Amino acid sequence: LAPSGQRHRYLSPQELKRLGEVLDQPAASETSGTAATIIRLLVLTGARRGEIEGLKWSEVDFNFGMLRKETSKTGAKVIPLGRAALQILDDQRQWTSSNQVWVFPAQKGDGHFDGLSKEWGRIRRLAKIADVRIHDLRHTFASVGAGSGVGLPLIGGILGHRQASTTQRYAHLADTPLRSAANVIGSEIAAALFGSTAAVGANKERADA
């Protein structure tokens, strides 16, 4: 899914398991707990870092199971969500106030969380995947999809699908092959990351629990 000549790095099932074990460790701080939740969502959705770090609650559609990221003149990018990703977002919702704009608010000020880089350096060392970049989580999503028999057009659709910016134009995606494919891929990754989909818990490691 990337142009020829670009660096490719995917996490193996064993590496995903190690990553999951590190993410499940008790959080040393609220920052590390937030970073762990963001990393889970990145690998379970194939979304770009900025799409999750800067996610607003108004962009999360629990009814149709998708993220609807506003862009510019192109309308909106729709990211279908599997059950594991939806559960993480639902858990996260329990930890944020009803008037909070951001899914992952900053500890100070009115912006969103932006401390992922520092935390990722620590997490990947502990998981023994020191050469893995945050963007490689997106590559991993695509690789798992291909290995699960999901067609490349569907994977490409999940990673970069765009729709016009009205509810009527995107709501029908809830029952399309894109949503089904996202769930297949997410379930495969969750099985490796958590041991089973039942183990998914977005905030069980938070220091302020």
Stretches with model-predicted labels:
Residues 20-23, 44, 144, 154, ...:
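Conserved short hydrophobic patches within well-ordered secondary structure
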Residues 77-79:
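Short beta-strand segments
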Residues 2-3, 10, 68-74, 84-86, ...:
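Catalytic-site neighborhood detector that most strongly recognizes the C-terminal catalytic loop/helix
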Residues 59-66, 130-131, 150-169, 176, ...:
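Short, polar N-cap/turn motifs at the start of nucleic acid-interacting alpha helices
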Residues 21, 25-28, 91-100, 105-110, ...:
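C-terminal secondary-structure termini that scaffold catalytic or DNA-interacting sites
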Residues 1-49, 53-54, 63, 73-75, ...:
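Basic, Lys/Arg- and aromatic-enriched nucleic-acid-binding interface segment
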Residues 10-16, 64, 82-130, 207-209:
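Active-site/catalytic core of tyrosine-dependent DNA strand-transfer enzymes
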Residues 37-51, 122, 136-162, 169:
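C-terminal catalytic core of tyrosine-transesterase DNA break-rejoin enzymes
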